[in-house]
């Protein structure tokens, strides 16, 4: 809140927040997100990989507050980028130069990239309950694969056989539990 109120009329700020902040459904976190959207002062959000800071395992996101941005907002999910390395007793995630540049270019150019970034309007954010999580806006892709009747029948037989085995094991476990319970005595 202090940062928002300290900004000049067209000021900018970058704030590191716990990733839970960008999706919290109530409380001060949501109120701040609502304020940023209603006042149209959000440049974008980058969700970073876990362990990006070696001293904490907390997942963080970077909020880019931009009082001059009245148009679209870029949301980036960089959580799957980077490589985990051992740093003393801690593990940390390190981004390659190319990954860093990809994040910078995607953000600056407001580019939409499948499973990495989305460019959304303030109204889109309102419609998603003020969530700043890029994943909330990704298109769900379903791939259909054509199979023959024989392939279908074989898959169904496999599923049916597996189910039979599981039912049999379940019955055996049920019988064993009943047997154990019957053997319990009060002393």
Q: Which sequence ranges carry the predicted segments?
A:
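A conserved structural/catalytic subdomain of Rossmann-like adenosyl-cofactor enzymes
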Residues: 1-187
């Amino acid at each position: 809140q202090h940062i928002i109120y300290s900004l000049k009329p067209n000021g900018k700020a970058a704030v590191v927040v716990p990733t839970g902040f960008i999706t919290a459904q109530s409380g001060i976190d949501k109120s701040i997100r609502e304020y940023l959207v209603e006042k149209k002062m959000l440049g974008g959000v980058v969700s970073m990989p876990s362990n990006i800071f070696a001293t904490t395992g907390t997942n963080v996101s970077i909020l880019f507050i931009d009082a001059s941005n009245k148009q679209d907002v870029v949301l980036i999910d960089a959580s799957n980028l980077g490589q985990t390395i051992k740093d003393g007793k801690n593990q940390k995630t390190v981004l390659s130069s190319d990954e860093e540049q990809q994040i910078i270019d995607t953000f600056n150019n407001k580019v939409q990239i499948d499973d990495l970034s989305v460019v959304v309007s303030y109204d889109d954010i309102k419609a998603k309950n003020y969530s700043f999580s890029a994943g909330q806006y990704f298109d769900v892709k379903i791939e259909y694969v054509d199979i023959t009747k024989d392939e279908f029948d074989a898959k169904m037989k496999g599923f049916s056989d597996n189910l039979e085995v599981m039912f049999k094991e379940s019955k055996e476990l049920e019988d064993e539990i009943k047997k154990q319970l019957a053997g319990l005595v009060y002393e």
